[in-house]
């Protein structure tokens, strides 16, 4: 991508996501915008802005729209924690979303097929972007010891804390991870014609131990994810998209 300046916005659902993002990405210039805390960093041809959105779909969608209206970013990042829906995805692995599925929308039908309106794709849906991510994933594994997987995310404002629902989401949507907010951020970006990414780190296995695992693993997992995100944004990888 050739651009005099690339504007990147990062939507942080919770306090921990925002604080780790600010610290590890070395963001400063913290201020308040319409009741939201934001911070930023400019380096070479990259300008990154992070916003503390608040947890849940409404908070993250409204924060995404606020940032789009005020700053006109080229890219929006959905970031945060996720539960694993398959034994192939482990704690501290990073999942980069290809397609997100809103699974708990009442369409009056069984959870079998999601209408197109409830499916949103990221830039990793395109072959050229997949190749960039493949190169970056290999580099991250070799230099940082971090595992990055690309796949679908099931998104709904419902805790996935049992193997029945977990298996259903995996089988019917081919999803490898789940969380509350991804679809709301990606859909808001799509409706505004903004390219989107989703980097989500695994904190639990979407089973009966979900709450305990999420609480005990979250901070360490974020410490794994944000250095990777920092490299992707500021070390030239995003310029290749």
Per-region residue spans from a language model:
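His/Asp/Glu-rich mid-to-C-terminal helical/loop segments that flank catalytic regions of hydrolases
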Residues: 206-241
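Proline-aspartate-enriched helix->loop->beta-strand connector
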Residues: 72-77, 175
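Mid-sequence, gly/pro-rich, charge-dense loop/helix-turn segments that line enzyme active sites
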Residues: 84-173
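N-terminal short beta-loop-beta anion/metal-coordinating cradle
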Residues: 2-65, 71
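A C-terminal functional module that forms or caps the active site or interfaces directly
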Residues: 158-211
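Generic non-transmembrane alpha-helical segments
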Residues: 131-146, 188, 224-235
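Alpha-helix C-terminal capping segments
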Residues: 66-70, 88-89, 186-195
């Amino acid at each position: 991508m050739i651009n005099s300046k690339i504007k990147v916005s990062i939507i942080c659902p919770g306090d921990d996501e925002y604080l780790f993002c600010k610290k590890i990405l070395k963001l400063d210039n913290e201020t308040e915008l319409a009741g939201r805390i934001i911070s930023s960093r400019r380096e070479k041809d990259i300008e990154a802005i992070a916003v503390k959105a608040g947890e849940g779909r409404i908070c993250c969608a409204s924060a995404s729209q606020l940032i789009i209206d005020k700053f006109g970013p080229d890219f929006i990042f959905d970031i945060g924690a996720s539960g694993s829906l398959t034994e192939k995805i482990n704690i501290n692995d990073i999942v980069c979303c290809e397609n997100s599925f809103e699974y708990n929308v009442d369409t009056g039908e069984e959870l079998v097929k999601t209408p197109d309106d409830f499916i949103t794709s990221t830039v990793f849906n395109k072959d050229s972007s997949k190749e960039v991510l493949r190169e970056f994933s290999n580099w991250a594994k070799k230099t940082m010891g971090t595992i990055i997987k690309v796949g679908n995310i099931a998104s709904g404002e419902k805790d996935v804390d049992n193997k029945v629902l977990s298996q259903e989401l995996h089988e019917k949507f081919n999803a490898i991870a789940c969380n509350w907010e991804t679809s709301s951020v990606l859909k808001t970006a799509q409706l505004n014609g903004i390219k989107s990414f989703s980097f989500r780190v695994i904190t639990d296995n979407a089973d009966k131990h979900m709450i305990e695992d999420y609480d005990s693993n979250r901070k360490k997992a974020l410490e794994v994810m944000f250095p990777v995100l920092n490299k992707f944004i500021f070390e030239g990888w995003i310029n290749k998209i």
